[in-house]
């Protein structure tokens, strides 16, 4: 079953009850997910249990159940700390050049395995236009073990994506945290004319991947 069915099922449950939009929480494979739907668009996220030296990441899934196309991009995501200051997500190109470009091969392998493990924890988390599709395309265009590994890691980064009605996508959104967890606060998503807000209490057990 596709990601859009997973996310839209939550939206359908809310509509069936006639209740206003509310955050639904669930746990899978050790990750704590939150999902929220607004006028057909559904956003889901979970903190990934790893840090790549100076960066923290969240796994994101977005499904468009509305009647209109919309474009979602990593710059739509921000984190509001308890003191009110904002931490804005990195653009996909910055993730590749600043983060993945300096990571060791071992770090890249760990990043890939961490993200793929998070996907395997939710059998229904299968995007129509997400990580797996980007990975396959990148692997087809690259040759050499090191280049193919880097391409796969780059495919993890959430990229600007136009979602037609019924389409979905996923990826990792990265925040510069200087080696510290995101901490307590709110994940804020401003996209497609909607604002999604999630109370965020990440686990403190995240593993740090070294950059060289």
Q: What are the residue ranges of the model-derived segments?
A:
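Bacterial N-terminal signal peptides that target proteins for export
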Residues: 1-9
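Compositionally biased, intrinsically disordered low-complexity regions
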Residues: 7, 13, 208-210
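Hydrophobic h-region of N-terminal signal peptides that target proteins for export
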Residues: 11-20
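Conserved functional micro-motifs across diverse proteins
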Residues: 21-212
């Amino acid at each position: 079953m596709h990601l859009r069915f997973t996310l839209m099922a939550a939206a359908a449950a809310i509509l069936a009850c006639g209740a206003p939009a509310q955050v639904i929480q669930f746990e899978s494979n050790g990750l704590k997910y939150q999902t929220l739907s607004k006028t057909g668009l559904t956003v889901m996220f979970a903190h990934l249990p790893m840090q790549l030296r100076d960066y923290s990441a969240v796994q994101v899934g977005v499904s468009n159940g509305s009647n209109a196309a919309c474009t979602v991009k990593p710059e739509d995501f921000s984190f509001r700390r308890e003191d009110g200051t904002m931490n804005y997500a990195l653009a996909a190109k910055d993730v590749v050049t600043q983060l993945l470009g300096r990571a060791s091969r071992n770090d890249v392998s760990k990043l890939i395995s961490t993200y793929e493990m998070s996907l395997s924890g939710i059998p229904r988390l299968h995007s129509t236009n997400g990580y797996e599709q980007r990975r396959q395309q990148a692997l087809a265009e690259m040759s050499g073990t090191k280049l193919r590994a880097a391409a796969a890691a780059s495919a993890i980064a959430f990229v600007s994506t136009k979602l037609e009605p019924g389409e979905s996508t996923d990826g990792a959104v990265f925040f510069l945290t200087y080696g510290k967890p995101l901490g307590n606060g709110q994940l804020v998503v401003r996209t497609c004319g909607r604002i999604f807000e999630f109370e965020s209490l990440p686990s403190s057990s995240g593993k740090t991947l070294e950059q060289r």
